[in-house]
Amino acid sequence: MTTLENPEMQAQLLSAALPYMQRYENKHVVVKYGGHAMGNPELGKAFARDVALLKQSGVNPIVVHGGGPQIQAMLTKLGIESRFEGGLRVTDEKTVEVVEMVLAGSINKEIVALINAEGEWAIGLCGKDGNMVFAQKAHKTVIDPDSNIEKVLDLGFVGEPAEVDRTLLDLLARSEMIPVIAPVAPGRDGHTYNINADTFAGAIAGALAATRLLFLTDVPGVLDKDKKLIKELSVADAQALIRDGTISGGMIPKVETCIDAIRRGVEGVVILNGKTPHSVLLELFTEHGAGTLIVP
């Protein structure tokens, strides 16, 4: 008999989790769902069950999802070539139509169906619904390696959140529904914009003054120079680790997004491994958590 099949052990686990469930009761927890976990059916079911359990425990979960690999697969299938500027994808009019179709029309509904299969009421949304999010054109700059001059990149319809209205999300929370949100939003200029899912999740969490924002990634969290997991960091600690090179590469923008979310009013942001089954529950409902917590 395994630990989880032992009734006494099950009771002990539930008892140990109770104080943490009470801590998050009626609190907003935003979960950014992405990475390889999205492509694994078993991990997808485990994630949906975790989200359902959060709702049943009195938490108000909000899911924001990405879908980069699925977008690229559809662009390839349709014969639409991707153009890059400074290593970043340019989103033209044809591409943004595909992005919206894949994110809001396909992936979003798959996640909704998984959560609903666990007995909860999930509803699929994007930034356009209820004027929840308005975007503005993102401005990116790079240093030209030849001239060492800063160059402004035109990435087309790549945006960033400019305005977030929490009215619809509050209404859904009172209605016992779980919002699942695709990072697509309109601009005041009438165009549709594709927004980085991490940035979008941070803006949603900030508008809600969420207790936690969880980033499900393909790594355990922030690692020290000995490649050991750092359990907790202040914003100042995180900035120091970026300066000394401990935090490097693709982890830098992830941590900077965490810092930005905290400045927007989020109480704590966690980077954790979405490939670990039930990592959301391990983070919220156990003593030691499951990733790196960044706090003010």
From Swiss-Prot:
One of its GO terms (cellular component) is cytoplasm. GO terms for biological process: arginine biosynthetic process via ornithine; L-arginine biosynthetic process. It is found in: Cytoplasm. Pathway: Amino-acid biosynthesis; L-arginine biosynthesis; N(2)-acetyl-L-ornithine from L-glutamate: step 2/4. The record marks K32, K254 as: Transition state stabilizer. Disulfide bonds: none annotated. Catalyzes the ATP-dependent phosphorylation of N-acetyl-L-glutamate. PANTHER family: N-ACETYLGLUTAMATE SYNTHASE, N-ACETYLGLUTAMATE SYNTHASE, MITOCHONDRIAL. Belongs to the acetylglutamate kinase family. ArgB subfamily. This is Acetylglutamate kinase.
